[in-house]
A protein has these predicted regions:
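Short beta-strand/loop turn elements enriched in aromatics
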Residues: 44-61
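Short coil/turn segments at secondary-structure boundaries
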Residues: 41-49, 147, 233-240, 321
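Right-handed beta-helix
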Residues: 140-144, 314
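Non-catalytic DNA-recognition/assembly elements of restriction-modification systems
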Residues: 11-39, 62, 162, 207-230, ...
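Hydrophobic aliphatic residues
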Residues: 32-35, 93, 135, 139, ...
Length: 383
């Protein structure tokens, strides 16, 4: 590859050496027919008993989509456009959610789509694979800046058709597409490795705890369950020294102080993820929707207790009450039963599971690095 020193805005910064000159410029509306689908009536149960792919916006996470979660009948598909294999489809509804913005996939089977999706059918010299990469570069920004709506942020035909797109010759497109597909395949392989490691850890954990024998004690008999302290969201930052756990699986922000020491177990108290068990290696702030397990008795290893509770996460989540904002009562968590074997067995179990968890975390960081590298290359190789 070569770095292009030209100042022209129609030539990318990083390019394969055999290609020179400026790229062409057009608009999405000129180069593609745009089509948004629909949802067959669910009043007719036969509509969703067929074999025709019907893609919804939440399924557009990977480069390629082979099959949909729901299939519709041929009769239901008559009222929808059957998109050919190789069609690029993006999510256009619910873009206020970070995991939805910028998502899109290329169909690998003839498919129909819901109204929450938009399909791009080429009419000119831009291949869908190239459009996929272009959207992966720009889609997040498009969702943040241009989606409309109050509670739900959506994109429409009128918005999308106006976007300018610069593109090279078909020959250069094909080489770019092949290169980016290799990056995506590497990311996909890494993602599968992580999923396999998670499954392995789960299987090993189940096997170890199914055979463990020891004293059965309620959680409150071996520890102190402490509810966190709520912080006004105005005081939270996007980055900082101490993360804040407050009812979710990810930090809700960062604060300039902490109220829980490192190497502490936390359990989500409220929200859709209440019951989520986490081991915190760093000091952090425990919010109002977070329990921490403190003052663990000396004959119980903290890591053993963490792995035991993590293996029982589904059971802990079943302690939740309420519907709108479910939560777990402290008194119910206090009575949760824990099997405590001899200290040597505790250490043996925690060592095995900690190694598997550590391996998964390392591979996860590698995946983040791969995705960051891909985004860098997209920004350098596309306009």
């Amino acid at each position: 590859m070569k770095i292009d020193d030209k100042t022209s805005h129609n030539s990318p910064s990083l390019r394969f050496p055999e290609f020179t000159g400026e790229w062409e410029e057009s608009t999405i509306g000129k180069e593609f027919d745009l089509y948004s689908g629909n949802t067959p009536s669910r009043l007719n149960k036969e509509h969703f008993k067929g074999k025709v792919n019907w893609i919804s916006s939440g399924e557009l996470k990977n480069h390629y989509i082979y099959s949909s979660k729901e299939q519709i009948s041929e009769d239901a598909a008559k009222n929808l456009k059957l998109l050919p294999k190789g069609t690029f489809v993006i999510a256009i509804y619910g873009l206020e959610a970070e995991g939805v913005r910028g998502t899109g996939s290329i169909t690998q089977e003839p498919s129909t789509i819901s109204q929450a999706c938009m399909a791009f059918i080429p009419q000119g010299d831009i291949e869908n694979e190239f459009l996929y990469s272009w959207y992966k570069k720009h889609g997040e920004v498009i969702g943040v800046r241009y989606a409309q709506g109050t509670k739900q942020q959506n994109l429409s035909y009128d918005i999308l058709e106006k976007f300018k797109i610069a593109y090279p010759s078909i020959k250069e497109q094909k080489k770019l597409n092949k290169f980016i597909a290799l990056l995506d395949e590497r990311i996909a392989v890494q993602s599968r490795l992580i999923e396999d490691l998670k499954k392995l850890r789960c299987a090993v954990s189940n096997k170890l705890f199914q055979s463990v024998k020891g004293v059965v004690i309620p959680l409150s008999g071996i520890s102190n369950i402490v509810k966190g302290k709520q912080i006004n969201g105005d005081f939270l930052a996007e980055v900082g020294e101490y993360y804040v756990m407050n009812g979710g699986t990810e930090p809700s922000g960062y604060y300039d102080n902490y109220n829980v020491e490192a190497n502490t177990i936390s359990i989500s108290e409220g929200g859709n993820s209440c019951g989520y068990v986490q081991f915190n290696r760093m000091p952090f702030w425990s919010g109002g929707h977070c329990y921490t397990i403190q003052d663990i008795v000396s004959d119980v290893e903290t890591l053993y207790l963490y792995h035991y509770l993590k293996s029982k996460e589904d059971s802990i989540m079943k302690l939740r009450i309420g519907t709108g904002l479910p939560n777990i009562q402290k008194k119910d968590l206090a009575e949760f039963k824990v099997i405590i074997p001899a200290i040597e067995q505790q250490r043996r179990i925690s060592n095995i599971l900690s190694l598997l968890e550590r391996k998964t975390e390392i591979e996860g960081r590698m995946l983040i690095a791969m995705r960051t590298e891909k985004q860098y290359l997209l920004h350098q190789m596309l306009i």
